[in-house]
A protein has these predicted regions:
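Short, Lys/Arg-enriched, Trp-marked, Pro/Gly-tolerant hinge/linker segments that flank
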Residues: 11-35, 39-54, 67-75, 79
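Core residues of bacterial helix-turn-helix
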Residues: 54, 103-104, 115
Length: 140
């Protein structure tokens, strides 16, 4: 009876260790993905790049990211691209073509479609709206 109890406890502890390792592996993958996407989102827009770098399948990466953030990998990449585009539109005089190039788009038209799909406005409309707001704030 004592041996059986000991084996049950050993089995229980080994399962807890495996679960802990799985959790920490998922946390590690999520941290590594975050570091990779923060460094590479301007050039790399595809899930396959990040999965390859992490040596895991795209599906596994998608599950880990969704479980950890509530968002898809593509959503995270797109949010970072939009945030960077807004920053460049508001703080530089770069052309839309130059911004498109900096953000890894092959042409300005593709970037404009992407920006409008994600913000509801064209890049130039966004920039013009900011300039109007700045001008209004100066008049107050």
């Amino acid at each position: 009876a004592c041996n059986a109890l000991f084996l049950d406890i050993a089995d229980f502890l080994s399962r807890k260790t495996i679960i802990r390792k799985q959790v920490s592996h998922k946390d590690h993958v999520l941290q590594e993905f975050h570091a990779l996407v923060t460094r590479n989102f301007r050039e790399e827009h595809f899930v396959s790049f990040y999965a390859d770098k992490l040596a895991i399948s795209e599906q596994y990466l998608a599950r880990i990211v969704r479980a950890g953030t509530g968002k898809s990998v593509n959503t995270i990449i797109n949010e970072l691209l939009v945030m960077e585009a807004r920053t460049l539109l508001s703080s530089t005089k770069l052309t839309v073509g130059d911004i498109a190039s900096r953000l890894g788009f092959s042409d300005a038209a593709g970037f404009c479609k992407f920006f409008k799909r994600n913000t509801g406005r064209t890049p130039l409309s966004y920039r013009k709206g900011l300039l109007i707001l700045i001008e209004k704030s100066r008049l107050m």
